[in-house]
Amino acid sequence: CFEKSVHLNGKILHSFRIIPDRGSWLEVQFDTNDLAYVYLDRRRRRRKFLVTTFLRALGYPTERDLVSNFYNIQKLKISEKMNEESLASLMPFEDIMDGEVVVARSYEPLSIGVIRQLVALGQKTVEVIDSSEDEILVKSLKKDPAHDEESALKDIYRKLRPGDPPTAANARALLKRLFFDPKKYDLTRVGRYKINQKLKIDIDSNERIMVGEDFLAATKYLLGLKKGEGILDDIDHLGSRRVRAVGELLANQCRVGLARTERLVKERMTLFDVNIEGMTPQKLINPKALSAVVRDFFGRSQLSQFMDQTNPLAELTHKRRLSALGPGGLNRDRAGFEVRDVHTSHYGRICPIETPEGPNIGLINSMCTYARINEFGFIETPYRVVKKSKVTNTIEYLTADQEEGYLIAQANNPIDKKGGFLNERITARERGEFIEVDPSRVDYMDVSPKQLVSVAAGLIPFLEHDDANRALMGSNMQRQGVPLLRSDSPYIGTGLEEKAARDSRSVIVSEADGIVAASSAEYIITTKDGKLPVSE
């Protein structure tokens, strides 16, 4: 997650955070002097160390290993003909020595005076780095007290454990415990996928701990942000938010229950003599700890609700509801306007209309008509593929992140029988903005105007002529409608009614087409011609 904050003096400070599903948070932030510091504890902000120190500890121990990832180390041929322009932005990679006397310090700009001294000493070449693009990391390298892996590990340990004697072995064990132990640190498959996608690195999806390459790539991206390159993360964008399904929430509860069971088993094993005959797993393992947690999850969880079955629509809508509340989520009292507001990335994924009117407004939403959730928990919406200005019948589902780079035409743009656009200029979306473009630039097209809204909002006739506030009330009040004594179809419908009733599974569906021949409170008989077979 890449962010920026504004200091009291008005300076913009860029930062990034790596937030695992389980384990220690890691934050890197620039200070007002353009030095990048690592924070491993959000509460104790004083315990910080330079980003270069942390990189040395993560597997870039030597100066060359570290610097070569950020700057180009080159050999400079020394001559008296050099001028200030040719030396601009060049810095010695190492201290230049004359015996025990330092001629030029590393990472200090080269001057004509230094070049003359080197010519007098008879030195032909010198290793330099080119800092023309930026000098941001050079500042950290100058101030870094550590120059190898061991000193970096000791410096980190000294900051994190002030009272303990700093040794490289202790520091290595501490870092392993914090970031490299799968039992205590887990990015999950989603975390690994997002890191690979954002930083454009290719690390195996099964690698669920942090690796040195992750931190190095994140640091490079942060330096790019400082120079005006790259994009900051929008916390309300659906590319940064995912749906945690029931299975995932239950798995987390089971992990807690199994941890308690493990502790109880270990306690019993210390009390019993291991050599006693007749020791069985049944005597050691008490499943009550696990079953109590699972029962508590389904019985008392904030998200465990009694299903609304006033009518078929109420049931269907309740099953398709998304909540930002609950354990690990937001608090309705502290949630601000931004998190409740409609975002451009909600298009085709979260309905902008259907939401409660009370304090939960914007925190509880409904999925759009054609939206689905992918394996990582991100909401996808379908689009028709456009090839060479022709709309095809191929459907592709895209997440909010994936559709960022594409031009997407609206579903109501007129097309001919072969799929070609009839208008010379068509309305399309690009990064949430509506623009008029040439059909040749379009990549995808919406599948239907209905994909923008949820099932409840899609059941409102002439929705486009409705005021948004009235549509919100209408979509909520449809769920409160009770059945008629004599069922009757409405004069005006939208075509979604049958699909909503059928998919809610609250109506009886015949296995084959036919006409009702007989019915009672207990059975319904359908036959091809609507006549009961005559028994012999």
Where are these regions (language model features)?
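Conserved mixed alpha/beta core segments that line enzyme active sites in large multi-domain catalysts
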Residues: C1-V6, Q302-I364, Q478, P483-A517, ...
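A short macromolecule-binding patch
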Residues: K531-E536
